[in-house]
Amino acid sequence: MSTENTLSVADLARENVRNLVPYQSARRLGGNGDVWLNANEFPTAVEFQLTQQTLNRYPECQPKAVIENYAQYAGVKPEQVLVSRGADEGIELVIRAFCEPGKDAILYCPPTYGMYSVSAETLGVERRTVPALENWQLDLQGISDNLDGTKVVFVCSPNNPTGQLINPQDLRTLLELTRGKAIVVADEAYIEFCPQATLTGWLVEYPHLVILRTLSKAFALAGLRCGFTLANEEVINLLLKVIAPYPLSTPVADIAAQALSPQGINAMRDRVAQTVQERQYLVNALQQTACVEHVFDSETNYILARFTASSSVFKSLWDQGIILRDQNKQPSLSGCLRITVGTRQENQRVIDALRAEPV
């Protein structure tokens, strides 16, 4: 049989997938460290006991206990909540539900979380960027100029990796600019560290507002892969049309419901208080470290800092088993490294290693 016209497996793939650069998650980048401060995880494990043993049956698409517990915690109605495999799936669901490949676009404001771009590219949806201003706030004029053909605008607040909140008045202006034109997705993955800044109370005013949440950060359940989308019922019903039939396994739903119990939420708030205390300790120490040029304000469980020689610092700590997140390739973040707030022992190891660096 002739093989002249036979395509390779790669040739059979969609062109945009062949050209896709996958998201470089902390785990994908690897490393052989014993101090992992590169993925904004909680530094110690939380223990749960599995109570659901009926693993021979398929789980509910939207487990009732999880939905009701999260709705009560977030101060919304159960009909306004969708649970998914992490907030990353929520990003993809919104794009799939609202964007026509080859026709519509998403918009985001770098430097910010990389999965908005990767999800859109995977789905064949155009990506538009409006870089943040020098203070990392929204360029509202730039966004306004790019709304024609844009169906979804992603805003991360507090923003990853910079750590700051987006000005609430700017968010209101954005929601007014996009009313009747586009969905606005507010990524609140880190909102537990600044709960006063949540936009959940705005859902009644803005039918096109969507909020993303996760159990990966303050709830210390990054390995669970459980996230939430909060929106008005009309939006949730559209997302339910495109979600997989069984997004959460029975053990995941079991643990998530426990984490969202009154006891679980109290434990989360204790972890937040502990993290905020350690964050201030780390900020103070970094500000007194010679190789650190600037420490940026943070409303999260991580700190962004600019270094005099970030590449050599990153490699030096990597070689010592201290794994940070290099942000040099992000727009306007030259010389910056992101440091997750760890335990006191981990934070001290970072400081000791940095103070041993040549200046």
Swiss-Prot record:
PROSITE patterns: AA_TRANSFER_CLASS_2
EC number per UniProt: 2.6.1.9
Family: Belongs to the class-II pyridoxal-phosphate-dependent aminotransferase family. Histidinol-phosphate aminotransferase subfamily.
Description of how the protein assembles with itself and partners: Homodimer.
Record keywords, A-Z: Amino-acid biosynthesis, Aminotransferase, Histidine biosynthesis, Pyridoxal phosphate, Transferase
Catalytic activity annotation: L-histidinol phosphate + 2-oxoglutarate = 3-(imidazol-4-yl)-2-oxopropyl phosphate + L-glutamate
UniProt entry tagged with the keyword Transcription: no
Protein name, entry field: Histidinol-phosphate aminotransferase
Organism annotation: Salmonella dublin (strain CT_02021853)
Gene Ontology terms for molecular function: histidinol-phosphate transaminase activity; pyridoxal phosphate binding
Species lineage: Bacteria, Pseudomonadati, Pseudomonadota, Gammaproteobacteria, Enterobacterales
InterPro entries given in the database record: Aminotrans_II_pyridoxalP_BS (IPR001917), Aminotransferase_I/II_large (IPR004839), HisP_aminotrans (IPR005861), PyrdxlP-dep_Trfase (IPR015424), PyrdxlP-dep_Trfase_major (IPR015421), PyrdxlP-dep_Trfase_small (IPR015422)
Keyword Amino-acid biosynthesis on entry: yes
GO biological process: L-histidine biosynthetic process
Domain of life according to the entry: Bacteria
PTM-bearing positions, type N6-(pyridoxal phosphate)lysine: 217
Pathway in which this enzyme or protein is active: Amino-acid biosynthesis; L-histidine biosynthesis; L-histidine from 5-phospho-alpha-D-ribose 1-diphosphate: step 7/9
Top-tier EC class: transferase
Cofactor(s) needed by this chain: pyridoxal 5'-phosphate
CDD domains reported in the protein's UniProt record: AAT_like (cd00609)
